[in-house]
Regions:
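Intrinsically disordered, low-complexity regions enriched in serine, threonine, proline
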Residues: 138-140
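Extended glycan-interaction surfaces of carbohydrate-active proteins
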Residues: 1-37, 59-110, 115-119, 123-132, ...
Length: 143
């Protein structure tokens, strides 16, 4: 994972955001350049968080969240020169990546020592049955 992060940083970072791929090779057959891909940038947030680079994860997350428009929507790409969203808009893939990155950060911020069936705060999750099946006061521990 660390090698992949280093390769992404070396070859795909552009103005601090992540390109989906480099168009310089012409492999896609399309004219023109691409801009940094919002989902890829959120994926880097998650990778930073999971690899212990939490400060960098938070910094990039803050930058990316600052790109949303006035109603909180994201597009497919971001043009750092024009400072505007470009490409498909709104882009659900970008929003899904935002949620995934936020979850990755919440895991490291909370220490994520959670056992299955517990919430991030350590409490019992709603999907675990702790109610008794009878009046004996013993828990069934599940269904």
């Amino acid at each position: 994972v660390l090698g992949t992060i280093a390769a992404v940083e070396e070859d795909l970072l552009h103005n601090g955001l992540v390109m989906r791929y480099r168009t310089r090779s012409g492999v896609d057959g399309l004219e023109g350049d691409e801009h940094p891909f919002v989902a890829c940038s959120f994926w880097l947030v998650a990778a930073y968080a999971k690899s212990g680079r939490v400060k960098e994860a938070h910094a990039l997350m803050s930058r990316l969240v600052g790109l949303v428009n006035d109603v909180g929507l994201l597009s497919e790409e971001y043009d750092p020169t024009a400072k505007r969203m470009v490409g498909n808009f709104p882009q659900a893939f970008s929003h899904l990546a935002l949620v995934s990155a936020a979850f990755a950060l919440s895991e490291v911020d909370d220490g994520d020592d959670n056992e299955p069936g517990t919430t991030m705060s350590g409490g019992q999750s709603d999907d675990v049955d702790t109610e008794s099946d009878d009046d004996s006061g013993t828990s069934s521990g599940g269904r």
